[in-house]
Amino acid sequence: MVHICRLLVLMGMLLCLSAQFASSQHWSHGWYPGGKREIDIYDTSEVSGEIKLCEAGKCSYLRPQGRNILKTILLDALIRDFQKRK
């Protein structure tokens, strides 16, 4: 039993140390994963009509579809179940 406890402590310490030395993705302020940078659309002189509409709140494709998420998930599950039965 003592050997198992020591082994678990040693494994925990190795896990903590390996997490410190592992190379992980890091991005700086203003940068997003994948090397994409945040672009300030207000600095550009040419703003398309679609962006102006979206700023006014009339853009339907940028709004989160919170009500339809559950409905979509259930419909997809039913379709997959129906296709498996065929």
From Swiss-Prot:
It is found in: Secreted. The modification Pyrrolidone carboxylic acid is found at Q25. Residues 1-24 form the signal peptide. GO terms for molecular function: gonadotropin hormone-releasing hormone activity; gonadotropin-releasing hormone receptor binding. GO terms for cellular component: extracellular space. PANTHER family: GONADOLIBERIN, PROGONADOLIBERIN. This is Progonadoliberin-2.
